[in-house]
Amino acid sequence: MKSLLLLVLISFCWADHHSDNYTVDHDRVIHIQAENGPRLLVEAEQAKVFSRRGGNVTLPCKFYRDPTAFGSGTHKIRIKWTKLTSDYLKEVDVFVSMGYHKKTYGGYHGRVFLKGGSDNDASLVITDLTLEDYGRYKCEVIEGLEDDTAVVALDLQGVVFPYFPRLGRYNLNFHEAQQACLDQDAVIASFDQLYDAWRSGLDWCNAGWLSDGSVQYPITKPREPCGGQNTVPGVRNYGFWDKDKSRYDVFCFTSNFNGRFYYLIHPTKLTYDEAVQACLNDGAQIAKVGQIFAAWKLLGYDRCDAGWLADGSVRYPISRPRRRCSPSEAAVRFVGFPDKKHKLYGVYCFRAYN
């Protein structure tokens, strides 16, 4: 019995001595395979990747297997990619691969494939990115009874903008808000996108829907009645409301476009219908709200002429503030929703590239 106690004491002393000499190398991840530990490990080299609409991106994912656990490798490896919803309660199938059998789903058909850089590479390539591709993706690798996962976030370069229709503020339920963004070449923004916009200076005093069904608004300069006086800046959260009955504005998100946005040089000012026809005559279409915001934010477009847009609003983009042209800040200035038949303005057009 004394011998056993002595052996235990010696073991503890040895462990303490060596733990004092151990340093953690933060640049490397060392995986130790325990006897009953995981035999399959899945990792993403990057937690987040960035791209833009129309571009291509690779979602990184690699797997590491214990060859002694799988014998001669008779188990086929199954790779599955899914997209996570904002509440993580539902997954949308994207791509599945097992040997020579591969399948893509929904809007990803013809746009996704495995990178295949090495035998253990499960990275997914997505081409011709759309606004809807933004979000978090899960890479799952299955071999026999073993499986493991990794999550990668896909972020898009773009701009968040507040939106309300001709009817006025606080007139959209959640479903109408989604459609309103789509009509303006955009999608309803996520909380992360709104938060990033707030950090970049977005200040807006009207609450709007976000993609997760919450209602929030960003305040950089707290004041009455916008966030309250003597309070800290931040994204104010109204919480979750009835998607069918509750009515608010909406925050939309858009990204780079494949085309030309421009102010049409025309000898006279135009009614709304004349503006629509003038763009058509020029081989283009009347521009949408998302396109004027994308041109302003991503291309630095600047024009001190108010012009019609597709939704019947009149706006103008200023990236270089100056006297009589948004002197206080760079912004897309909103004139309003004038009478379409009697008010005369210029027009902004958009010509898509084939």
From Swiss-Prot:
Maturation-removed propeptide residues: 1-15
SUPFAM superfamilies: C-type lectin-like (SSF56436), Immunoglobulin (SSF48726)
Domain Ig-like V-type, chain residue ranges per copy: 38-152
GO molecular-function term, one example from the UniProt record: hyaluronic acid binding
Glycan-bearing residues: N21, N56
InterPro entries: C-type_lectin-like/link_sf, CTDL_fold, Hyaluronan_bind_Proteoglycan, Ig-like_dom, Ig-like_dom_sf, Ig-like_fold, Ig_sub, Ig_V-set
Annotated compartments: Secreted, Extracellular space, Extracellular matrix
Sorted UniProt keywords: Disulfide bond, Extracellular matrix, Glycoprotein, Hyaluronic acid, Immunoglobulin domain, Repeat, Secreted
Disulfide bonds: C61-C139, C181-C252, C205-C226, C279-C349, C304-C325
Alphabetized Pfam families for the sequence: V-set, Xlink
Domain Link span(s) in chain numbering: 159-254, 259-351
CDD domains attached to this UniProt entry: Ig_LP_like (cd05877), Link_domain_HAPLN_module_1 (cd03518), Link_domain_HAPLN_module_2 (cd03519)
GO cellular component term of the entry, any: perineuronal net
Family recorded in the similarity comment: Belongs to the HAPLN family.
Function: Stabilizes the aggregates of proteoglycan monomers with hyaluronic acid in the extracellular cartilage matrix.
Descriptive protein name: Hyaluronan and proteoglycan link protein 1
Provenance organism: Bos taurus (Bovine)
Gene: HAPLN1
